[in-house]
Amino acid sequence: YEGEEMSPNVFYTGAAPNQQAIPAVEYLLSEDGGAAKRFILLGTDYVYPRTTNKILRAFLHSKGIQDKDIEEVYTPFGYSDYQTIVSNIKKFSADGKTAVISTINGDSNVPFYKELANQGIKATDVPVIAFSVGEEELRGIDTKPLVGNLAAWNYFQSVD
């Protein structure tokens, strides 16, 4: 599971990275998903993002993506100053089709998505796929600039 631990006395529910992250990244690599060649793995600094990104880095290597085309960035819980990180995303994406894989946790998603909009980054240029954003966090922001960005989640309550 996310911490790569096992126990005969523990039963996990929810998607593991091989059920959530790998199919999502396969989509980003496909023509329909934009045929990304470069990836920014952006997450909150704790076990889930670090383990998921370790798995994704190995998966991307298996698809021929080199380390120079993968950047990992971690922020503390509650982080809100995304100006520099988003500016670096713009610079990194100048060298080819880039996607952001977000494992940002909780409320930190709001300032991240707001900063993407502030700097004019659209999903048609640099798509973001999120594994840790909830519907509740997005209710408080203007989602028009987010159209085209993606989320891979087990369940969306607002979807019929």
Regions found by a protein language model. Name each.
Residues Y1, V10, N149:
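Short clusters of hydrophobic/aromatic residues that line enzyme substrate/ligand-binding pockets
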Residues Y1, I101-V110, I129-L138:
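Ligand-binding clamshell of periplasmic/extracellular solute-binding protein-like
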Residues G3-E5:
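Gly/Ser-enriched beta-turn/beta-hairpin loop segments
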Residues S7, L116-D160:
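Extracellular/periplasmic periplasmic-binding protein-like sensory domains
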Residues P8-Q119, V159:
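Extracellular/periplasmic Venus flytrap/periplasmic-binding protein
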